[in-house]
């Protein structure tokens, strides 16, 4: 099991909560929605410089499908692509593959892994997306991102669209 500390704030304050006092989701809550999903795919490096690609299911039925792993640069170019079959028993976790990190990422600060898991029990389809960075975010060799915004009013709602020509980690928009 897991404990989610702390879900929300009971007054306006800077805190570790996933939801602020006004009910707005913070970055943590978006991540929590992903890591508490019924099926997940993750990459975990080991001490021998391998990358364990694993999947986990909380679904009480057997699942089958595939896991696609893409090694991409920060401009979105796919450098390598792998597809692995996945067959899980009910509520099972399993390592799908163990890969050599040196063969995946010659320049760890210029690439990342993107995972796309699609499983079904014959009735329901489950999808999960995840990523793995071979180095800390602060060491990623990113180009300067130009972020453009469009703010439109449609009937009673405002719509904010952000676009970037290159990755821009952890962009936050605040409307007042």
At which residue positions do the language-model features occur?
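Carbohydrate-binding surfaces of carbohydrate-active enzymes
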Residues: 1-176
């Amino acid at each position: 099991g897991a404990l989610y500390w702390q879900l929300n704030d009971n007054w306006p304050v800077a805190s570790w909560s996933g939801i602020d006092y006004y009910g707005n989701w913070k970055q943590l809550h978006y991540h929590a929605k992903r890591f508490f999903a019924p099926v997940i795919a993750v990459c975990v490096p080991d001490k021998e410089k391998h990358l364990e690609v694993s999947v986990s299911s909380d679904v009480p039925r057997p699942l089958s499908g595939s896991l696609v792993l893409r090694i991409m640069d920060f401009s979105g170019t796919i450098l390598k692509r792998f597809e692995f079959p996945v067959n899980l028993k009910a509520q099972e976790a399993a390592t799908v593959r163990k890969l050599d990190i040196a063969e995946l990422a010659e320049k760890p600060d210029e690439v990342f892994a993107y995972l796309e898991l699609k499983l079904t029990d014959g009735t329901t389809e489950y999808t999960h997306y995840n990523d793995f960075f071979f180095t800390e975010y602060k060491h990623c060799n990113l180009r300067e991102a130009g972020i453009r915004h469009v703010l439109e009013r449609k009937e009673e709602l405002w719509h904010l669209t952000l676009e970037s020509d290159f990755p821009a980690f952890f962009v936050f928009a605040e409307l007042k």
